[in-house]
Swiss-Prot record:
<dbReference type="InterPro" id="IPR023584">
    <property type="entry name" value="Ribosome_recyc_fac_dom"/>
</dbReference>
<protein>
    <recommendedName>
        <fullName>Ribosome-recycling factor</fullName>
    </recommendedName>
</protein>
<keyword id="KW-0963">Cytoplasm</keyword>
<dbReference type="Pfam" id="PF01765">
    <property type="entry name" value="RRF"/>
</dbReference>
<dbReference type="InterPro" id="IPR002661">
    <property type="entry name" value="Ribosome_recyc_fac"/>
</dbReference>
<comment type="similarity">
    <text>Belongs to the RRF family.</text>
</comment>
<dbReference type="GO" id="GO:0005737">
    <property type="term" value="C:cytoplasm"/>
</dbReference>
<comment type="function">
    <text>Responsible for the release of ribosomes from messenger RNA at the termination of protein biosynthesis. May increase the efficiency of translation by recycling ribosomes from one round of translation to another.</text>
</comment>
<dbReference type="InterPro" id="IPR036191">
    <property type="entry name" value="RRF_sf"/>
</dbReference>
<keyword id="KW-0648">Protein biosynthesis</keyword>
<dbReference type="GO" id="GO:0006415">
    <property type="term" value="P:translational termination"/>
</dbReference>
<dbReference type="GO" id="GO:0043023">
    <property type="term" value="F:ribosomal large subunit binding"/>
</dbReference>
Length: 185
């Protein structure tokens, strides 16, 4: 029973780190990346569709993204969606493809992005700690109900803390790599 609680908390912590990495992929670092466009949705055919399902997104150069829609009639809608995504880029529509030059980041913008990355990472750390707290609360409830012993509760608390420390260390490592990526471009 307590193993199920531990496993559940471990999975939630793992998902938190995965979500952090996905969110970091959305931060523009001055280098072209197709991940910047993963969350963009385009209004077409009466519904909102992910951009990557409507077009081929390629990176021919370090600071250039080319979006080649499978249906050329969607060029204007895709261009509009990219502008609305607030990525601080200006798409150029040549009638066949959309080219997006990724401008180099200014020093101020780099600092802002690094600050934003720290905030995102801190939110992930808080989330991991909350998962630990919930797991410990659940274990205490099991002990109170007589389903586990006090020794098992102490062992579970230690396991939750160990998992928390490991996932926070991973969050810190991911943050450090992202900050380095932001500051070196």
């Amino acid at each position: 029973m307590i193993e199920e609680v531990k496993k559940n908390c471990e999975e939630k912590m793992k998902k938190t780190v995965v979500a952090l990495k996905e969110e970091f992929n959305m931060l523009r670092t001055g280098r072209a990346s197709s991940a910047l466009f993963d969350k963009i949705r385009v209004n077409c055919y009466g519904e909102s569709t992910p951009l990557n399902q409507l077009a081929n997104i390629s990176i021919p150069e370090a600071r250039l993204v080319v979006i080649q829609p499978w249906d050329k009639g969607l060029l204007v809608e895709i261009e509009k969606a990219v502008l609305q995504a607030d990525l601080s880029v200006n798409p150029t529509n040549d009638g066949k493809v959309i080219r997006i030059a990724i401008p180099p980041l200014t020093e101020d913008r780099r600092k802002d992005l690094a600050k934003k990355a720290k905030t995102i990472a801190e939110n992930s750390r808080v989330s991991v700690r909350n998962i630990r707290r919930d797991g410990i609360d659940e274990a205490k409830k099991l002990q109170k109900d007589g389903k586990i012993s006090e020794d098992q509760l102490k062992t579970a608390e230690d396991a939750f803390q160990k998992s928390t420390d490991a996932y926070i260390a991973e969050i810190n490592k991911v943050l450090e790599a992202k900050e380095k990526e932001i500051m070196e471009n």
